[in-house]
């Protein structure tokens, strides 16, 4: 099932394609092939996509606790979705 917000996924794909296209790549012949994508590039782009997707789905919650002596404590928790 696709996520509710596809913008980070599309952005990751566009950035990945821009990184894979090299400006120095000039084809000397009509039949020359583009440079192959290496396994390191695939792993790096997959990790970046996973990281961006996790960041975009994280929920931030701030809790303020007041004590008797009027001091303020702040508790910040960042939770990720449970996959539902």
Curated annotation (Swiss-Prot):
Lineage: superkingdom: Viruses
A GO cellular component entry from the record: host cell endoplasmic reticulum membrane
Main location: host cell
Subcellular location: Host endoplasmic reticulum membrane
Membrane topology label: Multi-pass membrane protein
Transmembrane spans: 5-25, 31-51
GO biological process: transport of virus in host, cell to cell
Keywords recorded for this protein, A-Z: Host endoplasmic reticulum, Host membrane, Membrane, Transmembrane, Transmembrane helix, Transport, Viral movement protein
Residue intervals on the Cytoplasmic side: 26-30
Lumenal side, ranges: 1-4, 52-84
Role this protein plays: Cell-to-cell movement function.
Similarity field: Belongs to the carmovirus double gene block protein 2 family.
This protein's name: Double gene block protein 2
């Amino acid at each position: 099932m696709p996520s509710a917000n596809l913008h980070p996924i599309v952005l990751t794909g566009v950035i990945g394609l821009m990184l894979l296209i090299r400006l120095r790549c000039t084809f000397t012949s009509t039949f020359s092939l583009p440079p192959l994508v290496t396994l390191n590039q695939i792993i790096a782009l997959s990790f970046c996509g996973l990281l961006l997707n996790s960041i975009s789905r994280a929920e931030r919650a701030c809790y303020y606790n007041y004590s008797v002596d009027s001091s303020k404590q702040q508790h910040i928790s960042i939770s990720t979705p449970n996959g539902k």
